């Protein structure tokens, strides 16, 4: 039931007090011809409606959320408390810089900490998400070569295991995307060697990659990329695996984007809010978006980089997310962040060892923070697909993994338990997944018609795609 269906004419949740300010009528050209179709509900109606929806929803506060490549870790409530402090909550981006020195200091110090973590020289906090960070990075790449008069570089190389946003971001900027083949789940260095030429502007990599494998040839890849005059771009989606262990800048990357909403523990999902800062090495600092924050004596001020690509987001990005990430970093400290990565890798390998007993692991061996299993054998022998397995998992009150990604693995299940789950939770999740796989052989129709216990049963995704309904009509 929607909030509109609870509506009863004349029902009110509150009424405004009488005002001694004289009434003023807007010119007719600004007025609606008909009243807006807003629901008329009481306060209990509203509270019960949204409480009911919240109970039907699932979040990391309710249980494990092992979406691969999403880092759905538990988000400490302290972060929310700090972001809700009046000094952060009540400010406005149009205020003079001298009246928001605390906020500017926070942004400056956050930049400094993120640069130290990644090995970059400067950073912008403007981008609102990871893909937005990619787009910003690609704009910097384009402007960098344009400023050098090197306009023949039209290609960006992307591995076949990459996030789909990588080729999309490069294409949006006008680059031609060329795919690099994988060998044993990692970049095929020989194939990369064939593709690198004077037309290549950048190579985009995720390390660890989307299979949860560390690109062991990264130093060689960086050397090859730079020898041909191209830039090396780091998709920071999987930084949670290597904090305190290795830095993208030390691997040879020129540009890096981060996902503060993932690695640095701020709530995300359903489209946001996110934050995708972009860090660069010295030769690219002047191309960062404006405004940037710098320290001038005892004060913090805004400035415009000399060769800036311009704004990429209104004002200063998603500022509350920056506050939460800043809080998380200070709370964890250097040793704590390193421990985060150690536990993320340990949990992933423990869970993989459990799951490999009943599902195939195409690229087996030591993984980093996540791993990819395959239900291809299950599908061949039972007709049950990965999608059916994911839907059935919902009946056990937990969230399924990412499915059908990366594309180079058939019937893929991409699993990232994160560092915040304990052994008991991992054991229970493996037990549920094993039970579901067993059901696929014993009673496949149970999976093909799942879920059975959720408020909404299986949605007709084809119909939803072809005939979407975006608004309510009574």
From Swiss-Prot:
Gene3D superfamilies registered for this protein in UniProt: 6.20.440.10, Aspartate Aminotransferase, domain 1 (3.90.1150.10), Type I PLP-dependent aspartate aminotransferase-like (Major domain) (3.40.640.10)
GO biological process: one example: glycine decarboxylation via glycine cleavage system
CDD domains in the cross-refs: GDC-P
EC number of this enzyme: 1.4.4.2
CC terms in the record's Gene Ontology section: cytosol; glycine cleavage complex
Sites bearing N6-(pyridoxal phosphate)lysine, chain numbering: 262
UniProt GO MF annotations: glycine binding; glycine dehydrogenase (decarboxylating) activity; pyridoxal phosphate binding
InterPro entries: GcvPB (IPR023012), GDC-P_C (IPR049316), GDC-P_N (IPR049315), GDC_P (IPR020581), PyrdxlP-dep_Trfase (IPR015424), PyrdxlP-dep_Trfase_major (IPR015421), PyrdxlP-dep_Trfase_small (IPR015422)
SUPFAM superfamilies tied to this protein: PLP-dependent transferases (SSF53383)
Catalytic activity: N(6)-[(R)-lipoyl]-L-lysyl-[glycine-cleavage complex H protein] + glycine + H(+) = N(6)-[(R)-S(8)-aminomethyldihydrolipoyl]-L-lysyl-[glycine-cleavage complex H protein] + CO2
Pfam families from the UniProt entry: GcvP2_C, GDC-P
Keyword Lyase attached: no
CC cofactor: pyridoxal 5'-phosphate
Keyword annotations: Oxidoreductase, Pyridoxal phosphate
Stated family: Belongs to the GcvP family. C-terminal subunit subfamily.
Record text on subunit structure and interactions: The glycine cleavage system is composed of four proteins: P, T, L and H. In this organism, the P 'protein' is a heterodimer of two subunits.
The protein's role, per its UniProt record: The glycine cleavage system catalyzes the degradation of glycine. The P protein binds the alpha-amino group of glycine through its pyridoxal phosphate cofactor; CO(2) is released and the remaining methylamine moiety is then transferred to the lipoamide cofactor of the H protein.
Descriptive protein name: Probable glycine dehydrogenase (decarboxylating) subunit 2
Source species: Thermotoga petrophila (strain ATCC BAA-488 / DSM 13995 / JCM 10881 / RKU-1)
């Amino acid at each position: 039931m929607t909030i509109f269906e609870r509506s009863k004419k004349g029902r009110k949740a509150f009424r405004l007090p009488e005002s001694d300010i004289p009434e003023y009528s807007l010119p007719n050209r600004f007025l609606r011809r008909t009243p807006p179709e807003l629901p008329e509900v009481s306060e209990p109606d509203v509270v019960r409606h949204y409480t009911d929806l919240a109970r039907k929803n699932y979040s990391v506060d309710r249980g494990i959320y092992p979406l691969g490549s999403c880092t759905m870790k538990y988000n400490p409530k302290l972060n929310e408390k700090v972001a809700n402090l009046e000094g952060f909550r009540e400010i406005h981006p149009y205020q003079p810089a001298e009246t928001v020195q605390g906020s500017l200091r926070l942004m400056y110090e956050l930049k400094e900490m993120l640069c130290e973590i990644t090995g970059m020289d400067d950073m912008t906090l403007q981008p609102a998400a990871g893909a937005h960070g990619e787009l910003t990075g690609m704009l910097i790449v384009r402007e960098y070569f344009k400023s050098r008069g090197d306009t023949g570089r039209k290609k960006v190389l992307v591995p076949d295991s990459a996030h789909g946003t990588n080729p999309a971001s490069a294409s949006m900027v006008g680059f031609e995307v060329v795919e690099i083949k994988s060998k044993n789940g990692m970049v095929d260095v020989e194939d990369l060697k064939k593709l690198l030429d004077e037309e290549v502007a950048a190579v985009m990599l995720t390390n660890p990659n989307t299979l949860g494998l560390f690109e062991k040839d990264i130093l060689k890849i960086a050397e090859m990329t730079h020898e041909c005059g191209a830039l090396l771009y780091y998709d920071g989606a999987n930084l949670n695996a290597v904090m305190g262990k290795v830095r993208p800048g030390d691997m040879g990357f020129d540009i890096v984007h981060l996902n503060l909403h993932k690695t640095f523990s701020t709530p995300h999902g359903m489209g946001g809010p996110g934050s995708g800062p972009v860090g660069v090495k010295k030769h690219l600092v002047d191309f960062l978006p404006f405004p940037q924050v710098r320290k001038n004596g005892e004060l913090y001020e805004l400035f415009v980089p000399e060769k800036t690509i311009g704004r990429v987001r209104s004002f200063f990005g998603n500022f509350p997310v920056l506050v939460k990430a800043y809080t998380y970093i200070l709370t964890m400290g250097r040793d704590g962040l390193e421990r985060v990565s150690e536990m993320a890798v340990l949990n992933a390998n423990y869970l993989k060892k459990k799951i490999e007993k009943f599902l195939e692991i195409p690229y087996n061996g030591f993984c980093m923070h996540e791993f990819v299993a395959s239900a291809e054998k299950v599908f061949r022998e039972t007709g049950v697909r990965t999608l059916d397995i994911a839907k059935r998992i919902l009946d056990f009150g937990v969230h399924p993994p990412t499915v059908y990604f990366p594309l180079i693995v058939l019937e893929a299940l991409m699993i990232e338990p994160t560092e915040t789950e304990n052994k008991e939770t991992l054991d229970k999740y493996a037990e549920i997944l094993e039970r579901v796989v067993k059901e696929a052989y014993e009673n496949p129709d149970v999976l093909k018609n799942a879920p059975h216990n959720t408020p909404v049963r299986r949605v007709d995704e084809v119909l939803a795609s072809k005939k979407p309904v975006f608004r309510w009509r009574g």
